[in-house]
């Protein structure tokens, strides 16, 4: 029998928790009742859900970096620097690669190796290895809300530790933290794991603790058309709502054409709210997060700042509640704290200048919103149809059939038949739609837009367009044109 989209009964959930908390020694320090009391004492300005909702009411776009190092004191120093020097509105703990794959013994070895070397030898903060107490030390050392950001298909123990440790938001989902990150984890297993993470948040919510959940919007971060990304975000939001989550931040990764990106953020918010209403989820707070460019970055620092500023502009004009900040060292790997703060400051400058402004209405914007909503509806309708009305069943079958198909994903459970490319204006269209359940009108529109570009490029509509587009932005252009001979 497959897992279903049903709220996990409390008794069954508590039995599951006993097993999960035994998977690493730090799990024994999680005490739900004590954690509820601790979380209730966190002031509103350090609660992720409360602060996000306030920003949303005021129409403000906030800024959050990515950051994480393995040693506790260094991690605290890093976050304090991004808070004080960078001016971040929210703080992260980006979790290391070992923890993401539940390889806690190697995480422990990485901490010890980093201590001996006197420098970071891991790409994030191993929260499970440190445990509840040290996570609370991080929270108590800063003045801003904390969120765990990672990429973990099975984040059950991690979720227990970070929430008990005072983190009031957790990023991820059963699709977005599996298909773009893992090769051999089934959709059913990762959805089940994230239903647990969501049920934990729902339990806290039932006991008076308001926590935020954030599906990972960019997916593979490489030419992902808006409707596929939005469908995944809506599915993960609905799965979370079923488990009792009330504060959900749906996300989207910058594609590059500002009109399409603004249309996508507007559509994302409206579609998510519509589905919440349709299925009877009440008292929901839906906010949005816009991710600055997730693809290849220019190596030149000044050009990198230009790309960061474009993303900041789009985030502000789209009305996104939050923007995830990149750094000018993105092309080289893990940034210095100074470079990270520089990205935040550049972002905040743009956000402050554009405060209160919105992208003007136009016929082109309205058409793009209409198209995104129509494409997303095709996907969602088919998911519910093949699942017999059950969202989990439908999602599993949708991946099996290629009804949901994420471009450039490593997962063996992803069909990999969809290929995107930019049109002549830089909007991302479906070059090869695979088995996506679109109408003929939608398919014809996508093809027509790509034929317009092919005519301008003096070439055929083919896979080389996609290849050229993947490398274009890092070379300083949006659309990958053929090399002049």
From Swiss-Prot:
Question: Has keyword Isomerase?
Answer: yes
Keyword Isomerase present in the record's keywords: the answer is yes
- Which stretch is the leader sequence? none
Listed InterPro entries: Cbl-dep_enz_cat, Glu_mut_E, Glu_mut_E_C_dom_sf
Listed under catalytic activity are: (2S,3S)-3-methyl-L-aspartate = L-glutamate
Against Gene3D superfamilies, the record matches this protein to: 3.90.970.10, Methylmalonyl-CoA mutase
UniProt cross-references to Pfam families, sorted A to Z: Met_asp_mut_E (PF06368)
Q: Which residues bind L-glutamate?
A: 66, 100, 149-150, 171, 177, 181
E.C. number, please? 5.4.99.1
Pathway field of the UniProt record reads: Amino-acid degradation; L-glutamate degradation via mesaconate pathway; acetate and pyruvate from L-glutamate: step 1/4
**What does this protein need as cofactor?**
adenosylcob(III)alamin
Sites where the protein binds adenosylcob(III)alamin: 68, 123, 180, 297, 326, 330, 334
Keywords per UniProt: Cobalamin, Cobalt, Isomerase
Q: Which family does the record claim for this protein? A: Belongs to the methylaspartate mutase GlmE subunit family.
Q: What is this protein called?
A: Glutamate mutase epsilon subunit
Write down the species.
Answer: Treponema denticola (strain ATCC 35405 / DSM 14222 / CIP 103919 / JCM 8153 / KCTC 15104)
Phylogenetic placement of the source organism? Bacteria, Pseudomonadati, Spirochaetota, Spirochaetia, Spirochaetales
Q: Which gene encodes it?
A: glmE
């Amino acid at each position: 029998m497959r897992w279903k989209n049903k709220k996990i009964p409390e008794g069954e959930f508590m039995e599951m928790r006993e097993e999960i908390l035994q998977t690493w020694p730090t799990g024994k320090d999680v005490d739900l009742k004590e954690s509820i009391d601790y979380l209730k004492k966190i002031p509103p300005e350090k609660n992720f859900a409360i602060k996000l909702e306030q920003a949303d009411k005021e129409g403000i776009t906030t800024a959050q970096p990515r950051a994480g190092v393995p040693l506790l004191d260094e991690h605290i120093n890093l976050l304090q620097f991004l808070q004080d020097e960078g001016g971040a509105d929210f703080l992260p703990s980006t979790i290391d690669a070992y923890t993401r794959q539940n390889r806690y013994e190697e995480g422990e070895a990485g901490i010890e190796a980093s201590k001996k070397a006197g420098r970071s030898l891991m790409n994030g903060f191993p929260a499970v290895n440190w445990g509840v107490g040290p996570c609370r030390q991080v929270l108590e050392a800063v003045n801003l809300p904390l969120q765990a950001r990672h990429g973990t298909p099975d984040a059950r123990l991690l979720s227990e530790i970070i929430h008990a440790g005072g983190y009031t938001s957790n990023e991820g989902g059963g699709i977005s933290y599996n298909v773009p990150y893992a090769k051999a984890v089934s959709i059913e297993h990762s959805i089940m794991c994230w239903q647990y993470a969501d049920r934990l948040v729902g339990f806290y919510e039932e006991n008076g603790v308001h926590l935020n959940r954030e599906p990972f919007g960019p997916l593979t971060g490489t030419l992902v058309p808006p409707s596929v990304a939005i469908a995944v975000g809506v599915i993960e939001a609905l799965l979370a709502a079923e488990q009792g989550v009330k504060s959900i931040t749906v996300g989207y990764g910058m594609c590059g054409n500002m009109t399409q990106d603004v249309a996508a953020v507007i559509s994302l918010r409206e579609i998510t709210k519509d589905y919440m209403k349709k299925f009877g989820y009440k008292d929901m707070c839906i906010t949005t997060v816009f991710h600055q460019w997730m693809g290849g970055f220019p190596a030149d620092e000044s050009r990198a700042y230009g790309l960061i500023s474009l993303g900041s502009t789009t985030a502000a004009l789209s009305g996104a509640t939050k923007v995830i900040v990149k750094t000018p060292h993105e092309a080289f790997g893990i940034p210095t704290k100074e470079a990270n703060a520089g990205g935040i400051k550049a972002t905040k400058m743009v956000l402050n200048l554009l405060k209160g402004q919105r992208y003007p209405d136009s016929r082109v914007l309205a058409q793009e919103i209409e198209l995104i909503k129509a494409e997303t509806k095709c996907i969602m309708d088919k998911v519910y149809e093949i699942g017999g009305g059950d969202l989990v069943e439908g999602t599993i079958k949708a991946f099996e059939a290629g009804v949901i198909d994420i471009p450039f994903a490593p997962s063996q459970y992803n069909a990999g038949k969809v290929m995107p490319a930019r049109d002549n204006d830089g909007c991302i269209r479906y070059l090869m739609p695979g088995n996506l359940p679109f109408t003929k009108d939608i398919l014809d529109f996508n093809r027509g837009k790509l034929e317009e570009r092919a005519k301008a490029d003096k070439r055929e509509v083919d896979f080389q367009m996609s290849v050229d587009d993947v490398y274009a932005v890092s070379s300083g252009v949006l659309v990958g044109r053929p090399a002049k001979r």
